[in-house]
Amino acid sequence: MREKQENERRGKGLKQYIADRRLAAVSLVLGVLMGLMILLGIRYSRNELIYRTAGQFLGQLAGWAVCMTVMVWAICVGLDALGRGWPEIRDFQFGKFLPVNSYQKRTQARRGKDCEDQGSSRDVESQGRESKQRAAKNSDLGTWLKWMFLSWCVYLPVFLAVYPGIYSYDASAQLLQFYGKLPLTTHHPLIHTLYLGLCMKIAGRLFHTYQAGMALYALSQSFFMSAVFSLCLCRMKARRAPQWLCVASWMFWILNPYLTVFSFVTTKDVLFGAFFLLSFDTACCLVEDPEHFWRGMCQKKEDLDKERELDKEKNLNETGSRKEVGKTGDWLLFFVSVFFMCLFRNQGIYVFLFFVLAVCLFLRKKVYRINWFIGASLLVAALWYVLSGPIPTAFGVGKGDAREMLCVPMQQLARIYHEVPEKLAPEEKEYIETLIDPQALSEYVRVNADPVKSGFHTEVMQADMGRFVRTWAEIGKRHPDIYLDSFLMGNWGYWYIGDNQYWISYILYDGAYLEDDLNILHITRNSHFQALSDWLREATLTPAFQSVPMLSVLLNQAFPFWLMLFAAGFAVWKRRAYEILPMMLLLGCWGTLLLGPVVSLRYALPLIYCVPRLLEMIVGLTGKR
């Protein structure tokens, strides 16, 4: 009899999901979008057409869309079933491992459900509260130290394996500028150039070898990365994330060979990614709990004061510490992280302004403290502008080349010139040859804009910007299919989850630009753990992981974008669409990647770092009605 009742209850639950129109709509939209990305991704990864007619394309798209729609629906139902706790799950007490948001905890506290001793006096309560507050603070520091220790149990052997560090990517060019061999410009972030150069100079003077300078840079950067990851794990624990998620997040950040190796690489993308992660984490906290963050930040003053009084009397979290409404610590961490994010990569300011615009559109009403947010955002933008423009110019620092932002149009023009020159008018062909060196045009490749970019004459474009725009637009108007194909061919790795990725060759484990005329400090690899070094080289330079189903997805640079789409759809289904707001940071960053010169793992690092936080958002939404 009992088994029959359980089966009926389970059947009701499944019928409830089947009848859910919102879930069906979300699954369909995501399914069609994911199916389209898979279909196009297969075409571009193979560099050949897998469909010959529009009918074939639509037929294959329909098939992929149905498969992905069913998959999205099943994942949503499965996660929600786990969160709500069906009978079998309750038997295993799975629900206690799921995070409980502070609004639920406050409601339970007000109803007296979490009070073990309702007859205790107020004095005893306050004493217990103070002791728990002290214990919570000590626990936070202890947790941070624990994660740091565990991280360095992994990082120390890796440092010995790659000693003195991985001198790669733009390090040679930056040091040539730092030591005056090349003119100093803002092409590379000044803060990173100074940081790298000072490490070399300080350690070089102290130890009389620039190998020590490289080691100082690698150690300081990896220490900062482990500190950021440990801080994020502490914040996860404070938000009552399940223990398994904290452990899985640590494994993803620290045991992932790609991310671990990058912690010792001389590229600005690593530190940019760290500050991006902090910005995203704090932005998520601002919307995850409306009672304590968005309402606390934007609520009218009289309502805010009432809420604070209620919290002082009744609101205790599980550690006994009192949660303050509108806590400013997260906002301070957010703006500091955003500021340094912008300094370490120019694209950061565009991502941040895109997020601010989304916040202003979402919070249209002028309520308490919204002006503070706008004012602080403008202050960050102004500080970035002053430190990136007027001050460097005053000290004789040159500006970066504008061609870095024009990879998409120059590739489109080069594609037309290289593959279908007969479709160009004589004056158009002549202008393209003036704009881009013929030698660079002959070296054109579909998946990398660097060869064409190296021969692009910015001064020709700037001399007559109108002609450049007109020529590009007129050719594109005649051949929109080639323009679109060129654009997608240059960035398919950021939105297609599949094998045959070409980004694997851009993890420069053994360094780059090590010729004597470029490597003026003569930095060389001197591994003290050769076996581990050989394993890391093989792991980062060969696509062997693609044979493992789960790893081939988790270590794919398109995975963060897919996870973001799923998290956004899941939030819409749960009628918590405001949780999409912090994802505007991810969407903005992803959008800038589409305009880049090549698909590379280091460019996608900021998005990859945010994967555990996205998973926490999804887990936090499970079971909510």
Q: PLM features: residue spans?
A:
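Start-transfer (signal-anchor) and selected internal transmembrane alpha helices
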Residues: R2-G35, G55-Y155, L621-R625
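Membrane-interface anchor segments at the N-terminal boundary of transmembrane helices
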Residues: Q60, A212-L216, G490-P582, L586
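Transmembrane-helix motifs of polytopic, lipid-linked glycan transferases
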Residues: C115, L219-R240, L278
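Extracytoplasmic catalytic/substrate-binding loops of multi-pass membrane glycan-assembly enzymes
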Residues: V162-Q174, P183-C199, F207-A212, P606
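Specific aromatic-rich, kink-prone transmembrane helix
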Residues: Y179, L231, L271-W294, V338, ...
